[in-house]
Amino acid sequence: MTIIWIEDHDPLPDPARVPFPASGLGAAGLDLSPARLYEAYRKGLFPWYSPGEPVLWWSPDPRMVLHCRELHIGRSLAKRIRQFDRPPEAGPVAGSAPSLCVTLNRAFPAVIAHCAQRGAARIGLGAARAGRDWPAPGAAQGRDGTWITPDIIAVYTAWHRMGYVHSVETWIGGRLAGGLYGVGLGRCFFGESMFSLAADASKVALAYLVRHLQARGTAWIDCQQETPHLASLGARPAARADFLELLAAGRDAPAPPWGSGRLRADGRLEAQPVA
């Protein structure tokens, strides 16, 4: 297998034009910057590496994709989501912040910090622990949650401030109970990592994200690698060529600006800030 070494001034290879192995690992380098991330995601690449390694760039074949209309919500999860769907006045004091709510872009630093916990599980939405529920290739090889290195945190936080990376947070009793973050480009969304500190908290965040994406006109989420867990939620594998066609059609499509606040049951943002 040939891995292309990328100098800081070199462009990343384009999987639509350059042969990549089915595993997805096709390039490596040292540059990890917001500009490099922007180039990578537009080409269907994402970084995944461990401390001490160069930045490794992946484009697996097949690629796991969750089409928003196909999200599978079981009976127990649907019941849990309805608890979060109650309007603010359903809280203990009329007009107060509800004891259960879901927000967008209100606690990104906390979300990525939870996702980065060392030794975190990668699989298991709803488990009372942090982890990557959208696993990168190689997850089955036994690497732990340390793939979210300080450099990853720094560059994705910078990209968040630039408006490209977004978090969804689940709150229970005023405390952060779960969440996720990912990358938004045009009408494309790329899931990066999730965590859960209470049963179903990350699943609720995912359900609200899907609603919000649909309200924005985004039809799918890139889940990166195929796993039985993702399949149980309705995600299915797509050939790399098909995924790249989806990406090409959506990455430059006009989309509403992202915001911050409480997410409503219909996927839209509350006009007022969350207390």
Language-model segments: which ranges?
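N-acyltransferase acceptor-side catalytic subdomain
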Residues: 1-275
